[in-house]
Regions:
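Extracellular glycan-interacting surfaces
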Residues: 1-223
């Protein structure tokens, strides 16, 4: 949603903008026609628009359209650091090695109003990234990536786990919550210095019964 009269819809066939005109809605010319748009963000702070593309074999791309601009510019795509030698990182269900490579940008979120240019990004595999300059540079939040609880996350509907929801508390910028499929809900109250898994009371049917209530492996779909 971009304002009260405009919708931006990301689809496998492009990015569609739908505007309210009179008593009806009008679909404009699509952007990135024929491309898989995996995420879209309309920044409520300045009106910039961000679109993440999933090019399959050729990898993800991220584009930004400045407020009032006609065209798009490609900005930096988040990237993992090289995987250290000797580190074992596998999906606990499939036993497949988890690549330290961004396969898909799954969600984008704007930072607080008092921090212009701050963006957050969730990826497959389950990385959380932050940018301070409108997507020109990205930093992996190592405190979550290196958390021992991440080793329990597994792919649900995809080959690998991923972060699909990021919620920032606009009243307190230190508080952030992210949701993982499948890996539960994780929250921080110190801007990512430390994380806690929140999911007591949830239940999943994707694992053996004795682990159904484990908060760290819940198949959260949206937050």
């Amino acid at each position: 949603m971009a304002g009260t009269h405009t919708l931006h819809v990301a689809t496998r066939k492009g990015l569609f903008t739908i505007r309210r005109e009179g008593r009806g809605w009008q679909i404009g010319e699509p952007d990135f026609l024929g491309d898989n748009v995996s995420a879209v963000l309309s920044d409520p702070r300045d009106g910039a628009l961000y679109a993440a593309l999933d090019h399959g074999h050729f990898g993800p791309k991220l584009h930004r359209r400045a407020p009032g601009a006609e065209g798009w510019e490609e900005v930096m795509t988040p990237a993992f650091p090289p995987k250290p030698d000797g580190v074992e990182d596998v999906d606990p269900m499939s036993r497949r090695p988890i690549p330290w490579t961004v396969m898909r940008i799954w969600c984008l979120e704007a930072g607080p109003r008092n921090r212009p240019g701050e963006l957050w990004c969730g990826t497959i595999p389950g990385g959380l990234f932050q940018s301070h300059d409108a997507g020109r540079k990205w930093e992996l939040i190592r405190s979550l990536w290196d958390n021992p609880g991440r080793k329990q996350w597994f792919g649900c509907g995809g080959d690998f786990p991923g972060i699909h929801s990021i919620c920032l508390d606009q009243r307190d910028g230190r508080k952030i919550a992210v949701a993982v499929s499948s890996g539960g809900i994780w929250t921080t109250e110190d801007r990512g210095a430390t994380w806690a898994c929140r999911g007591k009371g949830m239940r999943t049917s994707l694992v053996p019964p004795e682990r159904a209530h484990d908060p760290g492996i819940q198949a959260v779909h949206l937050l």
